[in-house]
UniProtKB/Swiss-Prot annotation:
Name of the molecule in the record: Efflux pump FUB11
GO cellular component: plasma membrane
Subcellular location: Cell membrane
Record membrane topology: Multi-pass membrane protein
Top-level taxonomic group: Eukaryota
Biotech relevance: Fusaric acid is phytotoxic to plants such as cotton and banana. It has been shown to induce programmed cell death in plants. In addition to a mild toxicity to animals, fusaric acid exhibits acanthamoebicidal, antioomycete, and antimycobacterial activities.
Amino acid composition bias (Polar residues), ranges on this chain: 9-43
PANTHER family per the UniProt record, alphabetical: MAJOR FACILITATOR SUPERFAMILY (PTHR23502), MAJOR FACILITATOR SUPERFAMILY (MFS) PROFILE DOMAIN-CONTAINING PROTEIN (PTHR23502:SF186)
C-alpha cells in the first residue's frame, strides 16, 4: 500500500535559528519587507520571528534551492524533499522508525483492549443497572460497531490535515469519552459513550498502517506490518484477562478508568514523540509558508498535477468507494467475507468463554479471563512465524529477479485456513467438564494462530492485487469485519442456550471449514480471476504504467480510468447488441418478404 512519507524533523538548534531561519510574518508591529529575489534565490526578511521557523520548519536553505518553475501562478515553483531533509520520514534513523511503530501499535492495542476489557465487568454492569445479558453485551457490540465508521472518516482526514493532528484530536476525545463512561449514570449513557469511544478512538486502526507506509519502503514494510498486525488481535485477547480481575475486585467503573488511563498514556506518548510523517501534507504546508514568506508561488510536486480536492469530496469518496469495490469485485467480497467470519468468531469468544468456563466449570470472573491466554499465545506464535515468512518471501523475490505475483502472498493463508477449523472443532468437542481445562485452551491456540495467518496473508494479497485502490479495499474490509465483530456476540448466548456448548461452538467451525477452499482457489486461479475483475485489471495496468514510466498515479485517477473503461465497454456492448438486434430484424423482414 503506497502511502507517502511524513515525519517532522527535530527542532532546529538556537544557533541554526539565529543564522538560518525565517520568522513569523504575522507580527503586525513589524514593517512589511519585500523579499529580494535573484532568479530562484530569495532572501528572507531578517527581522521575522523565530517562532515561525520553529513551528513550520522553514529555513533559508529551503528558499535557496533551485526549484523548477518561475514562481508565478501559471508556473509555480515545484518543491520536493531535499536529499538530507529531516522532515522526510523515509530518511529517519531505523531506531526511530521502529520506536514509532511500537508507539502506534500500542495505540491500536489500547483501542482494541478497550473493546473486550468491558466483558470483564459485564456482571457488575448487569447488577448496577438491572439489565439483561443481551443489553449489557451491547457495550461490546456498539464499541466494535464504531470501528465500521471511524476509519472511513479518519483516513481521508489524515490526508487533508496530517496524521499527527488527526491522532491528537481523536485520541484526546476518545480518552475523555472513556473516562466519561466510568462515571455513566445510566445504561443508555454508557452505551452511547462506548459507541463514540470506538468510533473516535479507531483512528489508529487505519492511520497506523499509513504511518508505516510513510516511513518504510516496500522491502522493509512487511516486518513492520507484521509487528503492527498483532495489536488488533492481542488487544481483544488481553482485555478480558486484565478486565476479569479488575472488574471482580474493584467494579466496572474502575475498569473503564483503566481503559481511559491506557488510552491517555498512549495519546500523550504518541503526541510527544511521533512527528508528522505524511509527505503530501508536509510539502503542501511548506509550499504555503514559503509562498507567504517570499511572495512567490510554490506548490508541492505531489500536488502539482492533481485537481483541487475538498474535504467534502474526499469524505464522499471515502464513504462510497469502499462499498463499490466490495460489491463489484469478487476477490474483495469473498476474502472480506472470510476475514469477517473469523474476526466475528473471535469476538463471539468474549460472550462464549464465560458460558464455557465460568458457568460450565465454575471458574471465577478473574480466573475465567485467563481462558483467553490461548488466544494470546496463538497471536504471538503467528507474529513470530510471519517474521520468518517475510524473510522467505524476500528471498523468493530476490531469486526470481522480477516482481512477485499477488498469489505468492497466499501460502500462509492456506496453512491458516486449515488451522482455524482444526482449532475450533478441537475447542468445541473438548469443552466437557470431564476434560481437563487445558485441552480446549490448546485448541484456541491453533484457532488464533490460523486466524492471524489468514488475516495478514489475505490483506497482503488484496494490497498487492489492487495496489492503487488499496486504501479503499482496506476500508471496505475493515468496515465489513467490524460489522461481523459487532453482530456475533449479540446472538451467542441464545445460540449456546439452544444448541448446547458443543454444537454452538461448532457453528463457526463449520463456517470456517466451508471457507477453506478459497485460499487454494485464489492461489491456483487468482491471476485469471483478477484479469476478469474490472478494478483488479485496472490496478495491474496502473502498476505496469508506474513501473515502465516511473510515474505516480493517484487512486482518484485510477478510479476515473477504470470507470471510463467500464463505460466504454458498456457502450460497445450496447452498440453491438443493438447492431445484432437490427441485423436480426433485417433478416426477419427479408425472410417475410
Amino acid at each position: 500500500m503506497a502511502i507517502d512519507p511524513q515525519p517532522s524533523s527535530p527542532s532546529l538548534s538556537s544557533e541554526t535559528i539565529a543564522n538560518d531561519t525565517i520568522g513569523n510574518d504575522n507580527n503586525v508591529n513589524e514593517p512589511s519587507v519585500e523579499p529580494k529575489t535573484q532568479g530562484n534565490q530569495h532572501t528572507v526578511p531578517p527581522r521575522l520571528s523565530r517562532i515561525y521557523s520553529q513551528a513550520h520548519h522553514i529555513s533559508q536553505s529551503f528558499i535557496d534551492q533551485n526549484y523548477p518553475g518561475e514562481g508565478t501562478t501559471q508556473a509555480p515553483y515545484r518543491i520536493n524533499f531535499l536529499p538530507d531533509d529531516t522532515q522526510n520520514a523515509q530518511l529517519l534513523p531505523r531506531w526511530k522508525k521502529w520506536a514509532f511503530v511500537l508507539l502506534q501499535s500500542l495505540a491500536c492495542l489500547a483501542t482494541t483492549f478497550a473493546s473486550s476489557a468491558y466483558s470483564g465487568g459485564i456482571k457488575q454492569v448487569i447488577r448496577a443497572f438491572g439489565i439483561s445479558q443481551e443489553v449489557a453485551t451491547l457495550g461490546i457490540s456498539l464499541y466494535v460497531l464504531g470501528f465500521t465508521f471511524g476509519p472511513l472518516i479518519w483516513a481521508p482526514l489524515s490526508e487533508l490535515y496530517g496524521r499527527k493532528k488527526v491522532f491528537f484530536f481523536t485520541f484526546m476525545v476518545a480518552t475523555a469519552f472513556s473516562a466519561g463512561a466510568a462515571g455513566a449514570g445510566s445504561i443508555a449513557s454508557l452505551l452511547v459513550l462506548r459507541f463514540l469511544t470506538g468510533s473516535i478512538g479507531s483512528a489508529p486502526l487505519s492511520n497506523a498502517p499509513a504511518l508505516i507506509a510513510d516511513m518504510f519502503d516496500k522491502s522493509e514494510r512487511g516486518l513492520a506490518m507484521c509487528m503492527f498486525s498483532g495489536a488488533p488481535f492481542l488487544g481483544p485477547a488481553i482485555g478480558p484477562i486484565a478486565g476479569g480481575f479488575l472488574g471482580e475486585a474493584a467494579g466496572w467503573r474502575w475498569l473503564h478508568g483503566l481503559m481511559a488511563a491506557f488510552t491517555g498514556v498512549t495519546w500523550i506518548a504518541c503526541t510527544v514523540f511521533i512527528p508528522e510523517t505524511y509527505a503530501p501534507y508536509i510539502l503542501r504546508k511548506r509550499a504555503q509558508h514559503m509562498s507567504k514568506l517570499t511572495g512567490k508561488v510554490y506548490i508541492s510536486t505531489l500536488d502539482a498535477d492533481k485537481p483541487p480536492s475538498s474535504a467534502a469530496h474526499q469524505l464522499k469518496n471515502a464513504l462510497t468507494r469502499p462499498w463499490l469495490l466490495l460489491f463489484k469485485e469478487p476477490i474483495v467480497f469473498i476474502t472480506s467475507i472470510y476475514i469477517s467470519i473469523i474476526y466475528g468468531t473471535m469476538y463471539m469468544c468474549f460472550a462464549a468463554f464465560p458460558i464455557v468456563f465460568q458457568k460450565g466449570r465454575g471458574w471465577s470472573q478473574g480466573i475465567g479471563g485467563l481462558a483467553f491466554t490461548g488466544i494470546v499465545i496463538g497471536v504471538v506464535l503467528c507474529i513470530i512465524s510471519f517474521a520468518f515468512e517475510d524473510k522467505r518471501y524476500a528471498r523468493a523475490a530476490r531469486k526470481r529477479g522480477a516482481p512477485m505475483e499477488p498469489e505468492d502472498r497466499l501460502p500462509p493463508a492456506i496453512m491458516g485456513s486449515l488451522l482455524i477449523p482444526i482449532g475450533l472443532f478441537w475447542f468445541a468437542w473438548t469443552t466437557f467438564p470431564s476434560v481437563h481445562w487445558i485441552v480446549p485452551i490448546i485448541g484456541t491456540v491453533f484457532f488464533a494462530w490460523g486466524l492471524v495467518l489468514v488475516f495478514m496473508a489475505l490483506l497482503n494479497y488484496l494490497i498487492d492485487s489492487y495496489v492503487i485502490f488499496a486504501a479503499s479495499i482496506m476500508a471496505a474490509n475493515s468496515a465489513l469485519r467490524s460489522l461481523f465483530g459487532a453482530a456475533f456476540p449479540l446472538f451467542t448466548r441464545q445460540m449456546y442456550d439452544g444448541l448446547g456448548v458443543q454444537w454452538a461452538s461448532s457453528i463457526p467451525a463449520f463456517l470456517a471449514l466451508a471457507c477453506v477452499p478459497f485460499p487454494f482457489l485464489f492461489y491456483k486461479y487468482g491471476r485469471q480471476i483478477r484479469m476478469k475483475c474490472e478494478y483488479a485489471a485496472e490496478a495491474a495496468n496502473v502498476l505496469q504504467k508506474m513501473r515502465s514510466l516511473h510515474v505516480t498515479v493517484t487512486e482518484d485517477d485510477a478510479m476515473n480510468e477504470a470507470e471510463e473503461m467500464w463505460r466504454a465497454r458498456t457502450h460497445n456492448s450496447h452498440a453491438s447488441a443493438a447492431h445484432s438486434h437490427g441485423h436480426r430484424r433485417s433478416l426477419s423482414y427479408t425472410r417475410s418478404v
